[in-house]
Structures are given as structure tokens and as C-alpha cells.
Amino acid sequence: MALQFTEREFIPVLLGGDINAYSVARAFYEEYQVKSLVFGKYQTGPAYRSQIIDYTPNVDIDTMPVMLKIVNGIAQAHADKTIVLMGCGDNYVALVAQAKDADELADNIVAPYAPYSMLEQCQKKEIFYELCEKHGVPYPHTFTFTAQMLNAQGEAPAEVLDQIDFPFPMILKPSDGIMWWQHEFEGQKKAYEIADRAELEQVIRDSYASGYTDDLILQDRVPGNDEYMRVLTSYSDRNGKVRMMCLGH
């Protein structure tokens, strides 16, 4: 059976090409029967060739000049519509928020994001754990490694690592996920399960040698597979009040 589409008073414009972009486009289709315009970097990924998506690759879509030219062009071409602009990835959200703050988006574009200064703080993991501490939300035992702890050779001193009071294997992840992916290096991962001291020293050395300058978060590993994971998604209005929440398992 062929998919059915309905013309609405808005057009979803999504930035990104991975499963996040596809999931948002699917949600728009299931609720409103609209086709989303999706812009990713490459001709690949879950969003590419999907029947519910009009996908356009552009290797520079994650740069401000190219993003503005594309989305403002869409807004101009569809002046009678509201353009709902969403970033499907931390870097795209930051890009859109910065453009919104600078008032560089066309008047008929809606970008549902808080000011960039607030987003920048919220996406840093050590800030998140400070909020957990403040509000009594439990989280794994954590040690924060900073660039200032490195010695002159760009390595983690033994006396610093000796302060970690939880065992291997441990989890290591960057505090600033946006900056992290801007400095690629061999073997780079979103998060690591560190087996021993030698691997910990190597990952720290490689991370900062790449040009990454923010903190690294080391945590006690919580045992169990993905069946024990949960994800909480919430929506807040323009006044910062949470209006809905959805727990995923």
C-alpha cells in the first residue's frame, strides 16, 4: 500500500542523517502524514532513500553559512508555511540555537530551542552530574579528569590517576560531546569501557593530543546489558515548564 501524505501548514526541516533524524521524521509522519525535508552530510544512513523523507546530502550542512542558506532558502520558497527546524544531533542543535540567538533565521522558521548559552551548559556532563548532586538524583561514582592535570609530556600523572577510588573496568566519556567529534583520532569512541591502567593512560593521551581540551568523565561501571537502560525524553514550553515526558525502555 502506497504511503499517503497530507499537506499541512508547516514543513519539518531536519538536520542530520542518522537514526535520530529518521526517528523524528517518522514521528512527524505518523502524527501528521507529512514528508520531512532532511539534510545530512552523506548519501548514506537510515534517512537516505526513506519514503517518508526528502533527503539532500551536503557535506557542509554542519557549517553556519551553508545551513543558513539552505533553511532560509526553504523558508523563502514556502513563505506561506511555518518551517519547523530541528537539529537531530548535538552539533546541529547548537548550530540552530546560535543562529536563532543571532536572529539569522527567517521569520517563518520556528526553532524550538533555548538560548545557546543554556544549551552549552546543559550538554556538558559534569554540569549534569552537579545537578544530580543538587537534586539528590543517584549517578555512578565519578572522577573528572581535566586538561590541567596533564604533565608536560601530555600524559596523565600517576599521582592523579591514583586518586581514582573505583576499580577497572571503568567507563570513560568526554564531557563536551560536540567538541569531542570536532577532533577525530584513531580509535575514537563515544564512550569507552576501559579495561586497565595502560588503556586509561593511552585514551587520555590520545584524547588531548587530538586537540580536545575539555574534561573527561571517568565512572564506575554499572554492570548489566542494554535491557537495564532507560531513556527519559521531556518537552518544555518557552517558559521552561515541563509539559510532557516519555520513558523509553
PLM features per residue range, with description:
Residues 141, 169-205, 229-231:
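Glycine-rich phosphate-binding loop of ATP-grasp-fold ATP-dependent ligases
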Residues 106-109, 116-138, 156-157:
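Glycine-/Pro-rich loop/turn segments that contact NAD(P) or position catalytic residues
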Residues 121, 126, 144-150, 158, ...:
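Domain-scale recognition of functional cores that engage charged ligands
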Residues 195-249:
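Phosphate-binding site of ATP-dependent enzymes
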Residues 1-115, 150-159:
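ATP-binding N-terminal substructure of ATP-dependent carboxylate-amine bond-forming enzymes
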Residues 161-171:
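Acidic/histidine-enriched active-site and ligand-binding environments that engage anionic O-linkages
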Residues 34-37, 139-140, 216:
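Hydrophobic anchor at the start of a short beta-strand
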